[in-house]
UniProtKB/Swiss-Prot annotation:
UniProt protein name: Sperm protamine P1
GO cellular component, one term: nucleus
The family this protein is said to belong to: Belongs to the protamine P1 family.
InterPro entries the record matches: Protamine_P1
Function as written in the Swiss-Prot or TrEMBL entry: Protamines substitute for histones in the chromatin of sperm during the haploid phase of spermatogenesis. They compact sperm DNA into a highly condensed, stable and inactive complex.
Region (Disordered): 1-62
Record's keyword terms, sorted: Chromosome, Developmental protein, Differentiation, DNA condensation, DNA-binding, Nucleosome core, Nucleus, Spermatogenesis
Residue intervals passing through the bilayer: none
Tissue expression from the record: Testis.
One of the GO biological process terms: chromosome condensation
Gene: PRM1
Length: 62
């Protein structure tokens, strides 16, 4: 029984590590995209709403 418990623990640990690594990568990517969006928003304008709609769709996909 102890052996099984130990195995499950190590498995969960590896899973957490993988998830954490992926999350940090995604966060950095999101930050850069957000910066670019700020600039594009100024040029095109908020009244159009097309870029905003596209961004929300992209965000959901990511």
């Amino acid at each position: 029984m102890a052996r099984y418990r130990r195995h499950s623990r190590s498995r969960s640990r590896s899973r957490y590590r993988r998830r954490r690594r992926r999350r940090s990568r995604h966060h950095n990517r999101r930050r850069t995209y957000r910066r670019s969006r700020r600039h594009s928003r100024r040029r095109r304008g908020r009244r159009r709403g097309y870029s905003r709609r596209r961004y929300s769709r992209r965000r959901r996909r990511y």
